[in-house]
Amino acid sequence: MTNASKPPVVNCPICGATVKWLAENRWKPFCSERCKLIDLGQWATEKYRVPVEPKPDEGETPDQAERPQ
């Protein structure tokens, strides 16, 4: 068996279980639907966030956005 025929293996980001990266694995990179839903719930409750730079509202200058009201 050659390396080309072995599927890549990753760890489930939720529980750490070993997961083969195959087209048949409908939950990849997760090991199960349960882990996939746990991850979705963490995004929905904002446990995970994508960092962004806050932008001033339209029409505000940067100085106005920084001043307390």
UniProtKB/Swiss-Prot annotation:
A GO term for molecular function: DNA topoisomerase type II (double strand cut, ATP-hydrolyzing) inhibitor activity
Record-listed Zn(2+) binding positions: 12, 15, 31, 35
Cofactor binding description: Binds 1 zinc ion.
Gene3D superfamilies linked to this entry: Erythroid Transcription Factor GATA-1, subunit A
InterPro entries: DNA_gyrase_inhibitor_YacG, Znf_NHR/GATA
Keywords: Metal-binding, Zinc
One of the Pfam families matching this protein, by short name: YacG
Gene Ontology biological process terms in this record: regulation of DNA-templated transcription
SS bond partners: none
Zinc listed as a keyword: yes
Zinc listed as a keyword: yes
Coiled coil: none
Cofactor requirements of the protein: Zn(2+)
Oligomer and partners: Interacts with GyrB.
Biological function: Inhibits all the catalytic activities of DNA gyrase by preventing its interaction with DNA. Acts by binding directly to the C-terminal domain of GyrB, which probably disrupts DNA binding by the gyrase.
UniProt-recorded name of the protein: DNA gyrase inhibitor YacG
